[in-house]
Amino acid sequence: MDHQMKNLLERLFVRDQHVCPWWCCFTFDNFLRKLFHNPEKILRPYILKGSTVLDIGPGMGYFSIPLARMVGETGKVIAADVQPEMLRALWMRAKKAGVEHQMITHLCKTDSLGLNTQVDFVLAFWMVHEVPNPFLFFKEIRSLLQLSGKFLLSEPILHVNQAMFEKTVKTAESCGLTLMEKP
């Protein structure tokens, strides 16, 4: 394998910390994804009307927009990302879907969410492997969750193997989060 191809494969699949570029997320939001990651099936058990939900690293709204429908007119979805382009694309999609009144976009710092709103549910789908300091990240999540709040963590198997995921879960537990269930 030539050197350039090896570098590309390492960049795409090796388990390092990098932020998925905004322009790449168009490939994630397609009709096939719903076969594997159906937002309604995955999230409905945890979301009540009127809830305040935090979607961290929301991409272009694949989960945020269905979450906004689930929380209803009295609920809120805070979509937090480090890339302004991602948040702009999400906002346009939220307007097109008619859920902009439930949606709050929030630009994070690379080392902090920068939020102080208490939330009922936090979603971190395929993004914790991009976080520079998972310990501080989980501490911040714990501080934002209501006492009865829930946190759903999912990582991509191509970037995070089982041992790495178990380490991530242990880090989350060391920050006061409790493992409730696994798929």
Language-model regions: role of each:
Residues 1-22:
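N-terminal, positively charged/glycine-rich alpha-helical extensions of SAM-dependent methyltransferases
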Residues 18-35:
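Class I SAM-dependent methyltransferase Rossmann-like catalytic core
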Residues 33-49:
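Conserved alpha-helix/loop element of class I SAM-dependent methyltransferases that forms part
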Residues 54, 60-112:
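Class I SAM-dependent methyltransferase SAM/SAH-binding core
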Residues 111-122:
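A short acidic, Gly/Pro-enriched loop at the edge of an enzyme's catalytic core
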Residues 120-132:
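A short SAM/SAH-binding and catalytic strip from SAM-dependent methyltransferases
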Residues 135-147:
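A short glycine-rich, Lys/Arg-flanked "PGG" loop and its adjoining helix->strand segment in the class I
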Residues 148-155:
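Conserved beta-strand signature within the Rossmann-like core of class I S-adenosyl-L-methionine
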